[in-house]
């Protein structure tokens, strides 16, 4: 189940009714009688492979011209006459061809026919045009209906849901309106968007209709839960999120519409459309991802405004999505106190049309002045914690030094052979992935199955060998993480790896790539001198990729051979100084088990370009869960060091327990609350 928590509105006026609401909330796992059953069918492990034949926009144009297929150049797609549609479908009442209904993605070559709903890869399109293959393959290109089990559940839930204004109890209507912040959203707006309410689950139901409104393809349920003095929301999609490609509000879009506002929540679209009258669409996965399959539906618009949220994460997501849609037609609403989320703006009495007019262009020239940057600088100064990046929930001491995980950076991670580098970095990445960071794993040393087994054990925080009855539960939850794996193993060319990473960033909006490890990826073909030069070149390529794509890259590099009784330093990284120079962060897993006995490990941050803080903190390995937990509070001590070559700062001698100096801090051992991806401000 896809779950996304979002803080919401104050409940001071609803506290007397809290018990009643909490007693009735909860989405039933199965609305039909009988034993519980699984919602989704099992699928194979998500593995990201390189497209068979990468294609460029120029090659697509040449191919279409060579086969006499008329086409038009669009913002992110090429529009052509569809060979999958019948001639009668392509002509209007006058008998003249009215539009090009085939959309071909300029980056991937993936196509979609709006008339016949045929879709497929660029190789599928070539095979169809050239008459290769058989009828069965061409029939397979047609968009498939949802799984039978899913479609049955969709119909069952939709039939049980009723319009909110038809609830028999007026007190229940008022309670639901307040819980979801709909006090100023009219019934006409809810009716226009076909929004319903599921009483047994106390959830709003947003439908996903097929293009043209021909049928119901899926649902999104939004459940409100009391949390402290506010409300949190849980989203459930049917089918599962990876197959849920609904642009909520699409049936209301006219062919003549040239402007649209994109939001990350359905409730925001309701508020915007009601207040401004402009066409609004909601991205199916919020700020997490913009699937390329949705780009054809956005081709007709000359102006696209992103109003995704009120935090820096929403702002960064808007800039990333604008790159897919052609930045020259995209505008961004900057988060701020006077520019909250659309629903909050409506409830707070703001002028939403005026806010939209202040949207900033996503595209600018290569040279800018401070006048164009001052608002972004102010945004970082006013949101220091968010600007520092996403915080780890499992490694609070790492937050104290690195402050957070930031996009566009390069992290180099090293440690002695057998110290647990892969085990640690898998938990390190899993922590971020569990918080919604789209992650791509490139494991060149161990197989994906073995890596997935380790990560699943860490995710469940316990071995599943003796609890196989719980495997499906944890596997279902693990399967819904935005986690992908390259299928490479052993030596691969840097060009192939970078092309795969580029493809993943475009298709899956990957924000974090792990390469484990650099030496295995390079292989052993080069001579020693050539090998160092090749490694420097590869590190430079990864550095450029991280910067150009605003994607964090973590490189695992083996150290050079050192004496067992010596600690590793930044200079211990194999190769020249290129790795440490290009890296924004350098992490070293120190293993002292050969000197002081087993289990004595600690993580050293020897470089931190963000704010310069460096230091070390102890790690304690839990063999049962394969995790590196934080030691007890009385043992945990964060140590600041001046540089990576100096000795570790000793704790001060003091009779008082926990005494510290300016260069030493006590670790609390308590994980700080991680930044929520879509935290809503409380309305007054």
From Swiss-Prot:
InterPro entries: DNA_helicase_DnaB-like_C (IPR007694), P-loop_NTPase (IPR027417), TOPRIM_DnaG/twinkle (IPR034154), Twinkle-like (IPR027032). Its main location: mitochondrion. Residues 640-684 are annotated as: Might negatively regulate ATPase activity. It comes from the Eukaryota. Changing residue 319 to E: In PEOA3; the phenotype highly overlaps with sensory ataxic neuropathy dysarthria and ophthalmoparesis; reduces helicase activity and single-strand DNA binding. Residues 637-684 are annotated as: Disordered. Residues 405-590 are annotated as: Maybe required for stable oligomeric structure. GO terms for biological process: DNA-templated DNA replication; mitochondrial DNA replication; mitochondrial transcription; protein hexamerization. Residues 384-635 form the SF4 helicase domain. Residues 1-121 are annotated as: Contributes to single strand DNA binding activity. Residues 54-214 are annotated as: N-terminal region (NTR). High relative levels in skeletal muscle, testis and pancreas. Lower levels of expression in the heart, brain, placenta, lung, liver, kidney, spleen, thymus, prostate, ovary, small intestine, colon and leukocytes. Expression is coregulated with MRPL43. Residues 659-677 have a biased composition (Polar residues). GO terms for molecular function: 5'-3' DNA helicase activity; ATP binding; ATP hydrolysis activity; DNA helicase activity; identical protein binding; lipid binding; protease binding; single-stranded DNA binding. It is a peripheral membrane protein. GO terms for cellular component: mitochondrial chromosome; mitochondrial inner membrane; mitochondrial matrix; mitochondrial nucleoid; mitochondrion. Pfam families: AAA_25. It is found in: Mitochondrion matrix, Mitochondrion nucleoid; Mitochondrion inner membrane. Changing residue 374 to Q: In PEOA3; reduces helicase activity and alters nucleoid structure. Residues 215-335 are annotated as: Primase-like domain. Changing residue 315 to L: In PEOA3; reduced single-strand DNA binding; increased heptamer oligomerization; increased stability of the closed or 'compacted' conformation. Interacts with LONP1. N-terminus enhances protein stability and hexamer formation, which is important for DNA binding, and is required for DNA helicase activity and, ultimately, for mtDNA replisome processivity. It is linked to Progressive external ophthalmoplegia with mitochondrial DNA deletions, autosomal dominant, 3: A disorder characterized by progressive weakness of ocular muscles and levator muscle of the upper eyelid. In a minority of cases, it is associated with skeletal myopathy, which predominantly involves axial or proximal muscles and which causes abnormal fatigability and even permanent muscle weakness. Ragged-red fibers and atrophy are found on muscle biopsy. A large proportion of chronic ophthalmoplegias are associated with other symptoms, leading to a multisystemic pattern of this disease. Mitochondrial DNA depletion syndrome 7: A severe disease associated with mitochondrial dysfunction. Some patients are affected by progressive atrophy of the cerebellum, brain stem, the spinal cord, and sensory axonal neuropathy. Clinical features include hypotonia, athetosis, ataxia, ophthalmoplegia, sensorineural hearing deficit, sensory axonal neuropathy, epileptic encephalopathy and female hypogonadism. In some individuals liver dysfunction and multi-organ failure is present. This is Twinkle mtDNA helicase.
């Amino acid at each position: 189940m896809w779950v996304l928590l979002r803080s919401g509105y104050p409940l001071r006026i609803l506290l007397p009714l809290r018990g009643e609401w909490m007693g009735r909330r909860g989405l039933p796992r199965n609305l039909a009688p009988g034993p519980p059953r699984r919602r989704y069918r099992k699928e194979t492990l998500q593995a990201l492979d390189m497209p068979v034949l990468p294609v460029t926009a120029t090659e697509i144009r040449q191919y279409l011209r060579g086969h006499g297929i008329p086409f038009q150049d669009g913002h992110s797609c090429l529009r052509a006459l569809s060979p999958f549609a019948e001639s009668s479908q392509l002509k209007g009442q006058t008998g003249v061809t009215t539009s090009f209904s085939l959309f071909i993605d300029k980056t991937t070559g993936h196509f979609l026919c709006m008339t016949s709903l045929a879709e497929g890869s660029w190789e599928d399109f070539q095979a169809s045009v050239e008459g290769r293959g058989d009828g069965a393959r061409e029939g397979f290109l047609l968009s498939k209906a949802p799984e039978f089990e899913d479609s049955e559940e969709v119909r069952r839930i939709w039939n049980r849901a009723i319009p909110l204004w038809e609830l028999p109890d007026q007190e229940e209507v008022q309670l639901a309106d307040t819980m979801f912040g709909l006090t100023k959203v009219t019934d006409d707006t809810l009716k226009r968007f076909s929004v319903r309410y599921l009483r047994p689950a106390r959830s709003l139901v947003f439908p996903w209709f097929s293009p043209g409104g021909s049928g119901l393809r899926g649902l999104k349920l939004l459940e409100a839960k009391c949390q402290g003095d506010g409300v949190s929301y849980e989203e459930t999609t049917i089918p599962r999120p990876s197959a849920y490609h609904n642009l909520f509000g699409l049936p209301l879009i006219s062919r003549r519409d040239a402007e649209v506002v994109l939001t990350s929540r359905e409730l925001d679209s309701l508020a915007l459309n009601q207040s401004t009258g402009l066409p609004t669409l909601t991205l199916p996965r919020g700020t997490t991802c913009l699937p390329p399959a949705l780009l054809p539906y956005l081709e007709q618009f000359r102006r696209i405004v992103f109003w995704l949220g009120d935090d820096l994460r929403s702002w960064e997501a808007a800039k990333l999505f604008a790159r897919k849609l052609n930045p020259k037609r995209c505008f961004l609403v900057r988060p701020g106190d006077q520019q909250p989320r659309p629903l909050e703006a409506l409830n707070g009495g703001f002028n939403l049309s005026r806010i939209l007019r202040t949207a900033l262009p996503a595209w600018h020239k290569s040279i800018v002045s401070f006048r164009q940057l001052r608002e972004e600088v102010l945004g970082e100064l006013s949101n220091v914690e968010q600007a520092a990046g996403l915080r780890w929930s499992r490694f609070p001491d790492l937050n104290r030094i690195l402050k957070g995980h930031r996009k566009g950076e390069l992290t180099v991670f090293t440690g002695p052979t057998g110290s647990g580098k892969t085990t640690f970095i898998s938990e390190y990445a899993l922590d971020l992935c569990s918080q919604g960071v789209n992650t791509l794993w490139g494991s060149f040393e161990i197989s994906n199955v073995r890596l997935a087994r380790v990560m699943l054990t860490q995710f469940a925080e316990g071995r599943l060998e003796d609890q196989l009855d719980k495997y499906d539960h944890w596997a279902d939850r693990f399967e819904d993480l935005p986690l992908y794996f390259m299928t490479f193993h052993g030596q691969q060319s840097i060009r192939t790896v970078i092309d795969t990473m580029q493809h993943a960033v475009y298709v899956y909006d990957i924000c974090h790539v792990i390469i484990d490890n650099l030496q295995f990826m390079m292989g052993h073909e080069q001579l020693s001198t050539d090998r160092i030069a090749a490694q420097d070149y590869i590190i430079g390529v990864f550095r450029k990729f991280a910067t150009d794509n605003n994607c964090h890259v973590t490189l695992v590099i083996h150290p050079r051979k050192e004496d067992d009784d010596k600690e590793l330093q930044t200079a211990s990284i194999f190769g020249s100084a290129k790795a440490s120079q290009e890296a924004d962060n350098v992490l070293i897993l120190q293993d002292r088990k050969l000197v002081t006995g087993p289990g004595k490990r600690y993580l050293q941050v020897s470089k931190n370009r963000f704010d310069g803080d460096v230091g070390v903190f102890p790690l304690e390995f839990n063999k049962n869960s394969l995790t590196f937990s934080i030691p007890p509070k009385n043992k945990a001590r964060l140590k600041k060091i001046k540089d990576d070559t100096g000795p570790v700062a000793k704790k001060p001698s003091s009779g008082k327990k926990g005494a510290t100096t300016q260069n030493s801090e006590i670790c609390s051992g308590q994980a700080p609350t991680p930044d929520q991806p879509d935290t809503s401000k409380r309305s007054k």
